[in-house]
Curated annotation (Swiss-Prot):
UniProt main location, coarse: membrane
Glycosylation sites: N103
UniProt keyword list: Adaptive immunity, Cell membrane, Disulfide bond, Glycoprotein, Immunity, Immunoglobulin domain, Membrane, Receptor, Signal, T cell receptor
The keyword NADP appears for this protein: no
Signal peptide region: 1-21
Function: V region of the variable domain of T cell receptor (TR) beta chain that participates in the antigen recognition. Alpha-beta T cell receptors are antigen specific receptors which are essential to the immune response and are present on the cell surface of T lymphocytes. Recognize peptide-major histocompatibility (MH) (pMH) complexes that are displayed by antigen presenting cells (APC), a prerequisite for efficient T cell adaptive immunity against pathogens.
Entry keyword annotation includes Signal: yes
Protein name according to UniProt: T cell receptor beta variable 24-1
Amino acid sequence: MASLLFFCGAFYLLGTGSMDADVTQTPRNRITKTGKRIMLECSQTKGHDRMYWYRQDPGLGLQLIYYSFDVKDINKGEISDGYSVSRQAQAKFSLSLESAIPNQTALYFCATSDL
């Protein structure tokens, strides 16, 4: 029997800079089989330079996966293993789970900042 994983995206705006930034994550919710590749898209409309991907496991705080301070500027966070990102445009920052495993079941948050 194949294991199913549940990934839930949420909207999150980092508490620095402008508080009216529009940040969108797609898909909003995702269920997949173990071993499948998953892509989460983050887009923003305020032209912020900095974008971040976080993960929150049940009962724990946010953990930084990757961050970017500008287009094609990619930096690893504290838990980047098993993930990859792409930032080909200022307004978009994509997160990929290369091969979904049960311990990656979590809430995933995208954030932006202009500072």
